[in-house]
């Protein structure tokens, strides 16, 4: 059986394992106060072209989302997100559990628009009765979205303009950031994210690391005592150098970007195979997540040799996700493409 069910089903890049082995007998300070975290921070600051950015490493994406939103919001403030956003659907109400409301907006292919955000914010800021409502203070986006789609540079600029108008923070969940950056039609860079957002993160877990996410915080108000929020929410790893070392190993030689771009290219081969058979797509995605609508017969045929993720029922059958990753091989894709041709 070959796994196309997610992008976190393998261990780590060989370069990371080699670096871990080479340093295994060395000792380092704890809690991220080590030379490897400093080294990774320096690389990331160079990539985002911001020496003033605060870089912090946390073990997982849900922790990153929880800590950022907790640090950004007071008890009477809320977060605007797509109704398909990870914080709204896949994090066991972690945001609500900290006392913050999610103002969920209807998505179009996983995205929300500047117009929707402006209307939501205006309902509070221009509504005249703020004491009865939560104050929208942060906008949460994902890049790529849960449906594998991307925001364009212009869309992000438009959303940023709305956030500035209403004094809201802009936060981008980068749990698959590498695959978004590697897509053929992407027109955003890490530097753009640093300039247009207040905080975002670069994924490690799904892009070649054993674990870890690198938060990039450019807004000074969010930087203030941020590590205390991390500790309060269980996101400070005692052996913090393990994350710094992994990001340094992936980013210094550009392997991170090579592997994620390659994963996108492999996903396009899968997409082309389904298109050639006339299999309908649930959404147009240029990233490593491809969503197709399979009949029961087609689904059963492919399930004999492959793991994939079922997303729910559709009029013509079942929405199924095929997901490539940094570890996907050409041979695995060739096998799937051949079996798709037999459908």
PLM region spans:
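Conserved N-terminal alpha-helix of the aminotransferase class I/II PLP-enzyme fold
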Residues: 13-61, 83-88, 94
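Conserved PLP-anchoring active-site segment centered on the Schiff-base-forming lysine
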Residues: 71-89, 118
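Conserved C-terminal alpha-helix-loop-beta "cap" of PLP-dependent enzymes
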Residues: 74-76, 268-342
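Active-site C-terminal subdomain of aminotransferase-like
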Residues: 108, 135-136, 142, 150, ...
